[in-house]
UniProtKB/Swiss-Prot annotation:
Heme b binds at H62, H91. This is Hemoglobin subunit beta-A. Red blood cells. Residues 1-145 form the Globin domain. GO terms for molecular function: haptoglobin binding; heme binding; hemoglobin alpha binding; metal ion binding; organic acid binding; oxygen binding; oxygen carrier activity; peroxidase activity. It comes from the Eukaryota. SUPFAM superfamilies: Globin-like. The lineage of its organism: Eukaryota, Metazoa, Chordata, Craniata, Vertebrata. Keywords: Heme, Iron, Metal-binding, Oxygen transport, Transport. GO terms for cellular component: blood microparticle; haptoglobin-hemoglobin complex; hemoglobin complex. Involved in oxygen transport from the lung to the various peripheral tissues. Heterotetramer of two alpha chains and two beta chains. One of its GO terms (biological process) is hydrogen peroxide catabolic process. Belongs to the globin family.
Protein backbone atom coordinates (compact mmCIF):
# COMPACT_ATOMS: atom_id res chain seq x y z
CA UNK A 1 0.00 0.00 0.00
CA UNK A 2 2.30 2.78 1.24
CA UNK A 3 6.06 2.92 1.41
CA UNK A 4 7.75 3.89 4.68
CA UNK A 5 8.45 7.33 3.19
CA UNK A 6 4.79 7.80 2.18
CA UNK A 7 3.61 6.71 5.64
CA UNK A 8 5.94 9.22 7.26
CA UNK A 9 4.70 12.00 4.95
CA UNK A 10 0.97 11.39 5.50
CA UNK A 11 1.41 10.89 9.23
CA UNK A 12 3.39 14.11 9.63
CA UNK A 13 0.88 16.04 7.53
CA UNK A 14 -2.11 14.57 9.38
CA UNK A 15 -0.73 16.05 12.59
CA UNK A 16 -1.53 19.51 11.18
CA UNK A 17 -5.16 18.68 10.39
CA UNK A 18 -7.86 20.08 12.68
CA UNK A 19 -10.28 17.15 12.56
CA UNK A 20 -13.17 19.15 14.00
CA UNK A 21 -13.09 21.69 11.17
CA UNK A 22 -12.02 19.40 8.33
CA UNK A 23 -14.40 16.62 9.37
CA UNK A 24 -17.44 18.87 9.40
CA UNK A 25 -16.52 20.38 6.06
CA UNK A 26 -15.84 16.99 4.46
CA UNK A 27 -19.10 15.42 5.65
CA UNK A 28 -21.01 18.57 4.76
CA UNK A 29 -19.60 18.62 1.26
CA UNK A 30 -20.41 14.92 0.84
CA UNK A 31 -24.05 15.63 1.74
CA UNK A 32 -24.24 18.62 -0.62
CA UNK A 33 -22.36 17.17 -3.60
CA UNK A 34 -23.95 13.71 -3.31
CA UNK A 35 -27.40 14.51 -1.89
CA UNK A 36 -28.57 10.88 -1.91
CA UNK A 37 -26.19 10.31 1.02
CA UNK A 38 -28.46 12.51 3.16
CA UNK A 39 -30.86 9.59 3.68
CA UNK A 40 -28.47 8.19 6.28
CA UNK A 41 -28.66 11.44 8.26
CA UNK A 42 -32.39 12.21 8.36
CA UNK A 43 -32.21 12.66 12.14
CA UNK A 44 -29.82 15.59 11.69
CA UNK A 45 -32.62 18.07 10.99
CA UNK A 46 -32.51 20.67 8.22
CA UNK A 47 -30.40 19.51 5.28
CA UNK A 48 -32.50 21.34 2.67
CA UNK A 49 -29.84 23.75 1.38
CA UNK A 50 -26.06 23.83 1.14
CA UNK A 51 -25.94 26.52 3.84
CA UNK A 52 -28.18 24.46 6.11
CA UNK A 53 -25.95 21.42 5.69
CA UNK A 54 -22.65 23.25 6.11
CA UNK A 55 -23.86 25.06 9.25
CA UNK A 56 -25.66 22.09 10.81
CA UNK A 57 -24.09 21.34 14.22
CA UNK A 58 -24.95 17.63 13.95
CA UNK A 59 -23.16 17.41 10.59
CA UNK A 60 -20.12 19.12 12.10
CA UNK A 61 -20.15 16.85 15.17
CA UNK A 62 -20.51 13.67 13.12
CA UNK A 63 -17.83 14.85 10.70
CA UNK A 64 -15.45 15.20 13.64
CA UNK A 65 -16.42 11.70 14.80
CA UNK A 66 -15.70 10.33 11.31
CA UNK A 67 -12.29 11.98 11.20
CA UNK A 68 -11.49 10.85 14.74
CA UNK A 69 -11.93 7.30 13.42
CA UNK A 70 -9.85 8.18 10.35
CA UNK A 71 -7.15 9.49 12.72
CA UNK A 72 -7.16 6.11 14.45
CA UNK A 73 -6.59 4.52 11.05
CA UNK A 74 -3.66 6.88 10.44
CA UNK A 75 -2.01 5.30 13.50
CA UNK A 76 -2.55 1.79 12.10
CA UNK A 77 -1.81 2.12 8.39
CA UNK A 78 -0.55 -1.47 8.29
CA UNK A 79 -3.81 -2.87 9.70
CA UNK A 80 -6.67 -0.82 8.28
CA UNK A 81 -8.98 -3.85 7.98
CA UNK A 82 -8.48 -4.68 11.65
CA UNK A 83 -8.79 -1.06 12.71
CA UNK A 84 -12.07 -0.56 10.85
CA UNK A 85 -13.58 -4.05 11.34
CA UNK A 86 -16.21 -2.93 13.86
CA UNK A 87 -17.16 0.14 11.79
CA UNK A 88 -17.38 -2.02 8.67
CA UNK A 89 -19.76 -4.36 10.46
CA UNK A 90 -21.88 -1.45 11.75
CA UNK A 91 -22.14 0.25 8.35
CA UNK A 92 -22.87 -3.03 6.54
CA UNK A 93 -25.14 -4.95 8.90
CA UNK A 94 -26.99 -2.20 10.77
CA UNK A 95 -26.84 0.97 8.69
CA UNK A 96 -26.79 -0.65 5.22
CA UNK A 97 -24.55 2.05 3.78
CA UNK A 98 -23.55 1.58 0.14
CA UNK A 99 -19.78 0.97 0.34
CA UNK A 100 -19.29 3.26 -2.67
CA UNK A 101 -20.05 6.13 -0.27
CA UNK A 102 -16.78 5.45 1.57
CA UNK A 103 -14.88 6.15 -1.66
CA UNK A 104 -16.89 9.33 -2.21
CA UNK A 105 -16.15 10.59 1.29
CA UNK A 106 -12.45 9.79 0.86
CA UNK A 107 -12.31 11.80 -2.34
CA UNK A 108 -14.19 14.69 -0.72
CA UNK A 109 -11.72 14.59 2.18
CA UNK A 110 -8.83 14.97 -0.28
CA UNK A 111 -10.58 17.99 -1.84
CA UNK A 112 -11.05 19.56 1.59
CA UNK A 113 -7.40 18.98 2.50
CA UNK A 114 -6.32 20.62 -0.75
CA UNK A 115 -8.65 23.55 -0.14
CA UNK A 116 -7.48 24.04 3.44
CA UNK A 117 -3.75 23.55 2.92
CA UNK A 118 -3.21 24.94 -0.57
CA UNK A 119 0.33 24.55 -1.90
CA UNK A 120 1.38 22.66 1.21
CA UNK A 121 -0.85 19.80 -0.02
CA UNK A 122 1.46 18.93 -2.90
CA UNK A 123 0.54 16.59 -5.77
CA UNK A 124 2.83 13.95 -4.24
CA UNK A 125 1.10 14.28 -0.87
CA UNK A 126 -2.25 14.09 -2.63
CA UNK A 127 -1.18 10.86 -4.32
CA UNK A 128 -0.17 9.45 -0.93
CA UNK A 129 -3.49 10.47 0.64
CA UNK A 130 -5.43 8.95 -2.27
CA UNK A 131 -3.79 5.64 -1.33
CA UNK A 132 -4.78 6.12 2.31
CA UNK A 133 -8.42 6.99 1.61
CA UNK A 134 -8.66 4.08 -0.85
CA UNK A 135 -7.27 1.76 1.82
CA UNK A 136 -9.71 3.07 4.42
CA UNK A 137 -12.64 2.75 1.99
CA UNK A 138 -11.58 -0.81 1.21
CA UNK A 139 -11.31 -1.63 4.92
CA UNK A 140 -14.76 -0.17 5.62
CA UNK A 141 -16.20 -2.18 2.72
CA UNK A 142 -14.50 -5.40 3.89
CA UNK A 143 -17.62 -6.75 5.67
CA UNK A 144 -19.58 -6.47 2.42
CA UNK A 145 -17.39 -9.05 0.67
Amino acid sequence: MLTAEEKAAVTAFWGKVHVDEVGGEALGRLLVVYPWTQRFFESFGDLSTADAVMNNPKVKAHGKKVLDSFSDGMKHLDDLKGTFAALSELHCDKLHVDPENFKLLGNVLVVVLARNFGKEFTPVLQADFQKVVAGVANALAHRYH
